Curated annotation (Swiss-Prot):
SUPFAM superfamilies on file: P-loop containing nucleoside triphosphate hydrolases
Gene3D superfamilies, per database record: 1.10.8.60, DNA helicase RuvA subunit, C-terminal domain, P-loop containing nucleotide triphosphate hydrolases
Binding site for ATP: 18, 60-65, 256, 321, 393
UniProt cross-references to NCBIfam families, sorted A to Z: hslU (TIGR00390), PRK05201.1 (NF003544)
GO BP annotations listed: protein unfolding; proteolysis involved in protein catabolic process
Subcellular location: Cytoplasm
Protein name per Swiss-Prot or TrEMBL: ATP-dependent protease ATPase subunit HslU
Subunit architecture: A double ring-shaped homohexamer of HslV is capped on each side by a ring-shaped HslU homohexamer. The assembly of the HslU/HslV complex is dependent on binding of ATP.
Record gene name: hslU
Domain of life: Bacteria
Role, per record: ATPase subunit of a proteasome-like degradation complex; this subunit has chaperone activity. The binding of ATP and its subsequent hydrolysis by HslU are essential for unfolding of protein substrates subsequently hydrolyzed by HslV. HslU recognizes the N-terminal part of its protein substrates and unfolds these before they are guided to HslV for hydrolysis.
GO cellular component labels: HslUV protease complex
Amino acid sequence: MSEMTPREIVSELDSYIIGQDKAKRAVAIALRNRWRRMQLNEELRHEVTPKNILMIGPTGVGKTEIARRLAKLANAPFIKVEATKFTEVGYVGKEVDSIIRDLTDAAVKMVRHQSIEKMRYRAEELAEERILDVLIPPAKNNWGQPEETQEPSPTRQAFRKKLREGQLDDKEIEIDLAAAPVGVEIMAPPGMEEMTNQLQSMFQNIAGQKQKPRKIKIKEAFKLLIEEEAAKLVNPEELKQQAIDAVEQHGIVFIDEIDKICKRGQTSGPDVSREGVQRDLLPLVEGCTVSTKHGMVKTDHILFIASGAFQVSSPSDLIPELQGRLPIRVELQALTTDDFERILTEPSASLTEQYKALMATEGVTVEFTREGIRKIAEAAWQVNERTENIGARRLHTVLERLMEDISYDASESNGQSITIDAAYVGKHLDELVADEDLSRFIL
């Protein structure tokens, strides 16, 4: 798991997300508390439960982006789910328990990757020996078994040197490689994905792992053999246990669009995709044991971060029990013109940098002036104010409209330089921004 301090986490998030300091601080503290808890003695560690977070703010202000970036920083099992995908147990649709199953699958994949990386050096040695055995077959004894010699022959050593220097990369060899598992496509109704996964695993295990001769270049064979040998060095049962421990101690679940499962007004009949889902989430957030194909997983110490726009509902519309299990509330602010201007220039791989790089592939140099960027930010803010406020996502729409002519003609404009200043932006956007009907349907 990550050992970054809260200040380091916020600094890293600042590289991608503009503003929203309160939300960044909250997730940074929550992430650091995961590390702090692991430093306690076992008895006290069991008593310290995570303080779950509810992020509240209009659409397009950075809630989901914080989750995306946090997933990369956490170095822990992480999953992002949409609350609207689930229904109450017993109805058609995904059950909330599948969140923990998917989180465990992600953890197994993560732990397997880490284990393979640790074994890579040994796997490279074994892969090298297998390729050399094909190039220079070892001498065999009277029983047809390879003879065990104390020292490799000079010829083998010479080929080993060439192999390491890449001189044999393009040479084709025929070698036995693990055959791809038999694919069994099973169509299942919504909510039955777990059953189909188990059936597919069963059919693959019946087929077994077979070796199949393939004619392939040494460079490609080396990569495949490394993966194959590394997989042999990993203990599957130990790997599963490590993954379950990682989920139970460090797992993070981000539930997006939680406001969409709030009950609005008085409705008759069962509310299976709203209040029913909230009731099903309660035991997960409070702590329960979920059965997965890898084993039983306890959710007592999994951190839950929920987010929602709450534009047509409020956090108080959540059932009281769920409100109590999300004790930390963070409100994200709507974005201003200054924020839009910073979003266009400051983040790593900002939108303007992306468009410049895309046009550079056609040999077209695009430059954005400071006044031009300010004008784009003002246009996006005005459209947000006069129509639906979709936050920073409006910048994508405005920029795409602004760059439409340049993108269309770029293939025939090799070597040209284009400067996007306030006048250029005004020429292409002023009419659309001024006309409310046009901006509503086009921007």
